Amino acid sequence: MRYFPLLLCLLAITTAEFRNATKQVPVVMWHGMGDCCCNPLSMGSVKKLFEEQIPGVYVHSLQLGSSITKDIEHGFYANTNELVYMACIKIKNDPELKNGYNAIGFSQGAQFLRAVAQRCPNPPMKNLVSVGGQHQGVFGAPYCIGDNIMCNGVRRLIDLGAYLPFVQKRVVQAQYWHDPNQVEEYKKRSIFLADINNENNNNPTYKRNLLSLKNLVLVKFNQDHMVVPKDSSWFGFYKDGDIDTILPMNETDLYKEDRIGLKKLHESGRIHFMDVDGDHLQIPRSVLVNDIIKKYFM
């Protein structure tokens, strides 16, 4: 009988370890421009879909700001580096995420989550799914649906000059504006994209942290009118000084010089390319369930 308490302790430890081992990996989501964390017709619906497909899963849909209104506003007007920092703090302070998480980003939320992976390795991001992201930036002002005051304001400011300091520091889309005809200006003035793509100062921690991913899934929309060029969703982009030529990922300097680890990820079979027929973020439920959730989140 003297061993009975010890056996009970061992049983309790084993049970706890089993529960931790079988617990579903939690999910972090980051929405796109003009959206918010909890819109029942967009992110709220996606969150519900994850919860239906993965019983018991914890889903954290990031809200950047003190309110839904602020969250939407920050999709247009903010310093992206500050948003990424805020996201890192939220993720680190969420006890449900302490053992790691899978992530899915929609539109600009995709490259923002990549920045989280590169800058904030604790807790660890396991898989990153990018849905219509702009990883090499855009060279085309965002398409505005209807009379959207914030979106139309962004277009006017970018037309004024994306690399002007007061525009660059305040307009989110300007911070991943990539002008192939002003490459040096882009490298010098871009406060976000040029940094996370290691265009100037080679930050080895960015590469090391991104290489810790198990999978990087890149989803491109074949009729995308929002992401220009749409190949940016696959890390492709215009050739410097030539907007008539689009280079695929493996022909870009970002890949060939392996600045952030793309080449190594690719050669190790951890980058997965998906293309979807449709316009920006028009992903069928069946594709989201069968080709993304069941493959990379379960």
UniProtKB/Swiss-Prot annotation:
Source organism, top-level taxon: Eukaryota
Glycosylated sites: 20, 250
A GO term for molecular function: long-chain fatty acyl-CoA hydrolase activity
Record GO cellular component, one term: extracellular region
Signal peptide: 1-16
Keywords tagged on the record: Disulfide bond, Glycoprotein, Hydrolase, Signal
Role of this protein: Removes thioester-linked fatty acyl groups such as palmitate (hexadecanoate) from modified cysteine residues in proteins or peptides.
Protein known as: Palmitoyl-protein thioesterase 1
Source species of the chain: Caenorhabditis elegans
